[in-house]
Curated annotation (Swiss-Prot):
Record-stated family: Belongs to the serpin family.
Designated name of the protein: Serine protease inhibitor 88Ea
Tissue: Expressed in nurse cells and oocytes. Expressed in wings.
Keywords, comma-separated and alphabetical: Glycoprotein, Immunity, Melanin biosynthesis, Protease inhibitor, Secreted, Serine protease inhibitor, Signal
Single GO MF descriptor: serine-type endopeptidase inhibitor activity
Gene name for this UniProt entry: Spn88Ea
GO cellular component assignments: extracellular region; extracellular space
Length: 427
């Protein structure tokens, strides 16, 4: 399974940083990372709601994690009302200073790097700020964001600059996302590009057998269906028949412990802390929208905590999907507007020059098959018989469903999507 995501924000002339440079890092504040994780969750659900309302009949796939981290870079460089607006959208009300957030951000990066070295699943997330080489970058930004800062020549080497950014994205996503930026998207007027690239490649803890993958119907309505390659297996998985969400919630774990270290006779969650969570509503016209309206960070947490091991037959479509999103209108609906407005944007912690975010893009790609899934992103049938969902013997994803790639350790929604119609998805 391959999953990839890229978030990009291009900055044009029209940024200041007291909050980042005014206070030294305090190692005692690093435990605030738990608040950062909760903010990421709330942001993820808010972004999902905006996107699904904008595309009510389409398939959806994106990485809220990637977008959140690209916006964190903007937040670290912002000041004044721009900073306040970003803090609200990123759910940073718990932090009394920008340095608290940066400390949590640094610890998250350290923890992610340490965990990656100890597990077979590949998950990486990289942040980068590409500055114009003639743009004055504050000494504070160079010191505090040293790993993220790179200066390039947008003005006289425009095409080479575009290639540099695209090459960085391709490298971070293991060549899954190439040519993110087209020829007209970097110009001599570009002053700065904020980027995050996320990549995940994982094997199912319990793999589907290819010989059991057969053509089966996927229903988009009671009278309309398409044949899909349906993967099937029987096993013990964590399941919650969720009355609050009015859906069945199943966790398909990835292998995050090397086989030599796996515990024998363990529960489904002991050898994995990253899963694809499948949220399957009943099959009627408004059930998916009903579930989405009930979903938030707390309801997702509660549902996952209440799950119990069940022996169950699972059917899941095999699919591959890529989505490109223009983030400006999505972020505007979430409450981000000032950083795009040249007349009011302030990024004083990065530079003394007046600049604003000109454009923002997100690309996400996922492949799900019998072995597992690969994802990358870059940010430049059952029915209710009563009010309670029926306990299933089968979990058949043969009608529209929601999926979330969830990291239990950090309580992060890494990727999320809605599978509505297989006609527009590669199988």
């Amino acid at each position: 399974m391959h999953i990839l995501s890229i978030s990009l924000m291009a900055v044009l002339p029209a940024i200041a940083l007291a909050g980042l440079c005014g206070v030294e890092p305090d190692a005692g504040l690093l435990d605030q990372r738990l608040n950062l994780y909760k903010g990421q969750q709330n942001f993820a659900v808010s972004m999902l709601n905006v996107i699904r309302q904008s595309t009510p009949n389409e398939n959806v796939f994106f990485s809220p994690y990637s977008t959140y981290h690209a916006l964190l870079l903007a937040y670290f460089g912002s000041s004044g009302d721009t900073e306040k607006e970003l803090a609200k959208v990123l759910h940073l009300d718990w932090a009394d200073s920008k340095e608290v957030v940066r400390s949590a951000y640094i610890l998250e990066k350290m923890n992610r790097k340490e965990r990656q070295s100890k597990m077979p699943l590949e998950f990486s997330s990289a942040d980068r700020i590409f500055f114009a080489n003639d743009l004055h970058v504050t000494e504070c930004a160079r010191n505090r964001l040293a790993e993220e800062v790179q200066q390039i020549d947008f003005k006289s080497q425009t095409e080479e600059s575009r290639k540099q950014i695209n090459d960085w994205i391709a490298k971070q996503t293991h060549d899954q996302i190439r040519n993110m930026l087209s020829a007209d998207e970097i110009t001599p007027r570009t002053r700065l590009v904020l980027a995050n690239a996320a990549y995940l490649k994982g094997q199912w803890l319990s793999q589907f057998k290819t010989e059991k993958t057969v053509p089966m119907p996927f229903y988009t309505s009671p009278s309309n269906y398409s044949l899909v390659s349906m993967m099937q297996q029987k096993g013990t998985f964590l399941l919650n028949v969720d009355e609050q969400l009015r859906a069945h919630v199943l966790q398909l774990p990835y292998r995050t412990v090397f086989e030599s270290q796996e515990k024998e006779d363990s529960s489904p969650d002991e050898n994995s802390d990253i899963s694809m969570v499948l949220i399957l509503p009943p099959f009627n016209s408004n059930s998916l929208e009903d579930v989405l309206s009930r979903l938030n960070a707390d309801s997702l947490d509660d549902s996952l905590k209440q799950a119990m091991p069940r022996e169950i037959e699972v059917s899941l479509p095999k699919f591959e999907f890529e989505q490109r999103l223009e983030l400006n209108p999505i972020l505007a609906k979430m409450g981000v507007s000032k950083m795009f407005d040249e007349s009011v944007a302030t990024f004083d912690d990065l530079t003394s020059e007046t600049i604003s975010i000109g454009d923002s893009k997100h690309v996400a790609k996922i492949k799900v098959d019998e072995e597992g899934s690969t994802a990358a992103a870059a940010t430049v049938l059952f029915t209710y018989r009563s009010a309670r969902p029926v306990e299933p013997a089968k979990f058949e994803c043969n009608h529209p469903f929601l999926f979330v790639i969830y990291d239990r350790t950090s309580r992060s929604i890494l990727f999320t999507g809605i599978y509505r119609d297989p006609k527009t998805i590669k199988q």
